[in-house]
Amino acid sequence: HLMQFETLIMKVAGRSGVWYYGSYGCFCGAGGQGRPQDASDRCCFVHDCCYGKVNGCDPKKDFYTYSEENGDIVCGGDDPCKKEICECDKDAAICFRDNKDTYDNKYWFFPAKNCQEESEPC
């Protein structure tokens, strides 16, 4: 669920996903086209691809189960589809954390007209 994704980003990356990544580059936020502009935008591209591979549940609307163990997010539950959503979100949150140093404000509210290049495949 997107609200859980926001929570994971806060826990792992220590910042608001909605504020920092809700409209960043070509892939963070709604939609996505063109080429990722930097490492943080690539996190969103990979996350979009990950969601695209999920079958049998809705990544944006379905709630999943996770726990925290020694500071790490551990995806759980009996539903493999929902667990897959959790793994997508967890990986993206870690990616955001690992690329905070190269986050560039020039890609915040980046105009879609700058994302016209052909997209690479997942």
Swiss-Prot record:
Function description: Snake venom phospholipase A2 (PLA2) that has high lipolytic activity. PLA2 catalyzes the calcium-dependent hydrolysis of the 2-acyl groups in 3-sn-phosphoglycerides.
Gene3D superfamilies in UniProt: Phospholipase A2 domain
A GO MF term: calcium-dependent phospholipase A2 activity
PANTHER family (UniProt xref): PHOSPHOLIPASE A2 FAMILY MEMBER (PTHR11716), PHOSPHOLIPASE A2, MEMBRANE ASSOCIATED (PTHR11716:SF9)
Family annotation (Pfam families): Phospholip_A2_1
Keywords in alphabetical order: Calcium, Disulfide bond, Hydrolase, Lipid degradation, Lipid metabolism, Metal-binding, Secreted
GO biological process: arachidonate secretion; lipid catabolic process; negative regulation of T cell proliferation; phospholipid metabolic process
Active site per UniProt: 47, 89
Protein name: Acidic phospholipase A2 4
Chain sites annotated for binding Ca(2+): 27, 29, 31, 48
Tissue: Expressed by the venom gland.
